[in-house]
Amino acid sequence: ELRCAFVCGSGIVELYTNCSLMNSINGGKLWEDVAECVAWQKKNADVLPDAHWVGGNPWNGSAQEIYGWASWNGAKATLALRNGGNSAQTYTFTLREALEIPANITGSIILTKSFNVQDALQGLTEGVAIDVDQQLTVTLPGSSVFAFDGVNADPSQVPFEVIGRTPNTGVEA
């Protein structure tokens, strides 16, 4: 649940902590988890403004569907999926759909785990190029969250901006 507060991309995270509780769980491990989430959010500050909802509806009254958040800026991406139900569920999507990549953009994205401690997600191969139009069917165990960072598999396709130098200062503008 802590990761959800950060991967949703709101940019504003209010944390109300109970120090004795934080210290008592796994020998204070939650403090490390908070630090890891803060570092992740800082690392992805350039892509998180695009964060948007993906997947189903966790509040539909009859079943809890897989849902999450995704963002993409042409060079980087984030994808987080959550299964709030108690049983394993599958979710089928393309990276184009999840990341809301425009139709005129083609290519592949390489996804890797966002956090050090995270199981492999069944149906998604990390560290290899995945075409944005390839259909993926993933299976999330009950009560789970998976978060991934993505980069364009072909760096020559990443939009870039030329940074000039200001006259006589040598300082980048």
Where are these regions (language model features)?
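Active-site-proximal substrate-binding groove within the catalytic cores of carbohydrate-active enzymes
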Residues: E1-D119, D133-T137, P141-G142, F146
